[in-house]
C-alpha cells in the first residue's frame, strides 16, 4: 500500500471559520468530498437530484405486490479489499466494517459446464498469474508455447504514463487478441473481467484495461477477494453517512437538482430550481450527462480548453439489471455470485438470498429465491424483449433447475449513464482540478494520479477534490491510499529520477499547476 498526501501535506487541523462548500451530487464521490470537508470544519451543503443518496450505488424503496417493502438497487456491487479509500469512508460509520461479509470465491461459468475459479491463488504477482495459468483446464503446454509472451508481459509492466502513451490508441480487444490465448482461455480468463468495467472490448482503451489488470490482479496485494454488504445500501451505507454528515453540521438537500453554477469575484453562486446558494468551494460530483448539461447552462465556466476536456467525456453502452423473485429454491451449493461468459449477453448471476439479509428473510418465509441477472455493454440494436429472452435462456443453461420455477415478482432496469473509457480517451480526460480556484470535479470518470476503478475511483476522487480545496487554507489533507503505482517489471529508471517523476506526476495531476504527461 502507498500513501499520498495530495496536493500538499498542510499544517492546520481545521479550516478557518465561515467557509461554505456546496457538493453537487450525493453519490460516493460527493459524500466522500463532503465528509472530508465537514470533518475539518467546513460548512457543507450536499445537493442531490434524487430522493435518495448514493448515486449509481444508491437504493430506493419499492413494494412487492404483497405490499411488502424492499430496497431496490442498480445491481450487485463488490467491495474489493484494495478499495482502501472507499473502506476508509465506510469506517466512519462502521469502524469494524461489520456491514460487509466476504465472498471467498466467485466462479466463472462458461458453456458446456466449463468453470474457472480464483480461490486459493497466491496473492502476489507473478505467482498468482503462474498458478492460474498452470491450473486452468483451458490451456495446455502447446497453447502456452503459442502465447505472445512480450504482449502478456505488459500486464506486469504497468507504469501510468508509459502505459497510456503506448496503449491508449489500441482497443482492449486488439490487445487481448495479440496475446494469442486459445479462445476458451480468453473467454474464461479475460472476457468476464473486461466486461465487468461496462465498456465493450471493441471500444475500450487497452491502456485502461491494463490499468485494470494491474489494479485488480497483478498489482493487487489483497488478492481477488471481495466483500458484499449484508443489508441494502440505503440502510448500511447511505442513511448512516447522511447522519454522520448532519452530526457535523452538513445540510443535505434531496430531490433538488442543480441547474447552473455562476462564478463570483470571491466564490460561486449555485442555482437550483428553488433557491440560490453562495459558496467558497464547489465540487461537481455528477454523472457525465448531468455534468455536461450543467456546464452548458453555466456560461461563466467557459474555459475553452477545459470545456473541450469535459465535452470529450462519453457514455458506454447500456447495462441491464433483472431481479427475479422465484417460487422455489436453487440447487444447493450455488455460488452467491458467478460471472458468466459465452452464453448470450448474460454477464453474471447474483443470488441475493445467499448474502443480503432482506432477500434471505424473504426466501426463508416463502421457500423461494431472489435471483439477479446482469448484462453489460448491451448493443443498442437489442430490444428489451430480445434481451429478456436472452438472459433467461442463459440462466436456464447455467442453472437448469430454474426452468421449473415460476417468477412471482420482477424488477427490470436498463440504464445508460456509466462513463466510457474508449480508445484515445485518456489524453483529453479531465482530472479533479479545474481551471477555477475552488471548483473541482469528482466521479469515476476522472483521471487520477494512482490506479483506481469503479467505486474506489469515485471515493478517491471525492477525497482528492476536498483536499485540493483545503490546500488553499493549508489544512491537512485526507491521506489517500493505493496499491503500488508501478508493476513489478515496469521499465527500470534511476531511483532519484523515478522519485522526481512520480512526485511531479502526482502533484501536477492533482493541482493542474504545470504541464504533465498525465495532466488533469
Regions found by a protein language model. Name each.
Residues 2, 17, 256-371, 376-382, ...:
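Mid-domain catalytic core of redox enzymes
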Residues 18-46:
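N-terminal Rossmann-like FAD-binding beta1-loop-alpha1 element of flavoenzymes
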Residues 1-21, 39-40, 62, 485, ...:
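Extreme N-terminal leader/targeting segments of oxidoreductases
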Residues 446-469, 473:
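A conserved FAD-binding loop/helix module that cradles the flavin
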Amino acid at each position: 500500500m502507498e500513501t499520498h498526501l495530495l496536493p500538499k501535506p498542510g499544517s492546520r487541523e481545521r479550516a478557518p471559520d465561515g467557509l461554505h462548500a456546496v457538493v453537487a451530487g450525493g453519490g460516493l464521490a460527493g459524500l466522500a468530498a463532503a465528509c472530508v470537508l465537514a470533518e475539518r470544519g467546513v460548512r457543507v451543503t450536499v445537493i442531490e437530484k434524487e430522493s435518495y443518496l448514493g448515486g449509481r450505488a444508491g437504493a430506493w424503496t419499492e413494494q412487492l405486490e404483497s405490499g411488502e417493502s424492499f430496497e431496490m438497487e442498480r445491481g450487485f456491487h463488490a467491495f474489493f479489499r484494495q478499495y482502501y479509500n472507499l473502506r476508509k469512508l465506510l469506517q466512519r460509520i462502521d469502524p469494524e466494517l461489520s456491514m460487509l461479509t466476504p465472498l471467498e470465491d466467485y466462479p466463472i461459468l462458461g458453456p458446456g459446464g466449463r468453470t474457472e475459479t480464483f480461490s486459493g491463488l497466491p496473492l502476489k504477482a507473478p505467482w498468482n498469474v503462474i498458478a492460474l495459468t498452470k491450473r486452468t483446464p483451458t490451456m495446455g503446454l502447446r497453447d502456452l508455447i503459442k502465447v505472445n509472451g512480450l504482449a502478456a508481459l505488459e500486464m506486469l509492466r504497468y507504469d501510468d504514463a508509459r502505459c497510456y502513451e503506448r496503449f491508449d490508441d489500441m482497443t482492449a480487444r486488439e490487445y487481448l487478441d495479440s496475446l494469442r490465448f486459445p479462445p476458451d482461455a480468453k473467454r474464461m480468463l479475460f472476457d468476464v473481467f473486461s466486461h465487468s468495467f461496462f465498456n465493450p472490448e471493441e471500444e475500450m482503451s487497452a491502456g485502461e484495461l491494463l490499468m485494470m489488470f494491474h489494479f485488480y490482479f497483478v498489482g493487487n496485494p489483497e488478492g481477488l477477494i471481495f466483500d458484499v454488504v449484508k443489508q441494502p445500501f440505503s440502510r448500511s451505507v447511505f442513511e448512516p453517512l447522511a447522519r454522520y454528515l448532519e452530526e457535523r453540521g452538513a445540510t443535505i438537500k434531496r430531490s433538488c437538482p442543480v441547474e447552473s453554477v455562476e462564478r463570483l469575484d470571491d466564490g460561486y453562486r449555485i442555482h437550483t430550481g428553488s433557491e440560490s446558494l453562495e459558496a467558497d468551494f464547489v465540487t461537481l460530483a455528477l454523472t457525465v450527462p448531468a455534468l455536461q448539461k450543467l456546464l452548458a447552462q453555466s456560461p461563466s465556466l467557459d474555459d475553452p480548453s477545459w470545456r473541450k476536456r469535459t465535452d470529450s467525456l462519453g457514455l458506454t453502452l447500456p447495462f441491464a439489471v433483472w431481479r427475479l423473485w422465484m417460487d422455489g429454491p436453487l440447487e444447493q451449493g450455488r455460488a452467491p455470485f458467478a460471472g458468466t461468459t459465452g452464453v448470450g449477453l448474460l454477464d453474471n448471476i447474483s443470488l441475493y438470498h445467499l448474502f443480503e439479509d432482506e432477500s434471505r428473510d424473504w426466501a426463508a418465509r416463502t421457500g423461494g429465491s431472489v435471483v439477479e441477472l446482469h448484462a453489460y455493454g448491451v448493443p443498442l440494436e437489442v430490444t428489451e424483449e430480445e434481451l429478456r429472452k436472452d438472459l433467461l435462456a442463459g440462466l436456464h443453461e447455467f442453472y437448469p433447475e430454474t426452468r421449473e420455477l415460476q417468477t412471482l415478482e420482477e424488477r427490470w432496469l436498463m440504464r445508460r449513464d456509466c462513463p466510457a473509457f474508449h480508445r484515445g480517451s485518456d489524453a483529453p480526460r479531465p482530472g479533479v482540478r479545474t481551471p477555477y480556484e475552488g471548483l473541482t470535479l469528482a466521479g469515476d470518470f476522472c483521471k487520477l494520479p494512482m490506479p483506481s476503478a469503479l467505486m474506489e475511483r469515485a471515493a478517491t476522487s471525492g477525497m482528492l477534490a476536498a483536499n485540493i480545496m483545503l490546500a488553499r487554507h493549508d489544512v491537512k489533507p485526507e491521506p489517500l491510499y493505493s496499491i503500488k503505482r508501478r508493476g513489478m517489471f515496469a521499465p527500470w529508471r534511476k531511483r532519484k529520477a523515478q522519485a522526481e517523476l512520480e512526485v511531479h506526476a502526482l502533484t501536477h495531476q492533482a493541482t493542474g499547476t504545470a504541464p504533465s504527461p498525465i495532466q488533469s
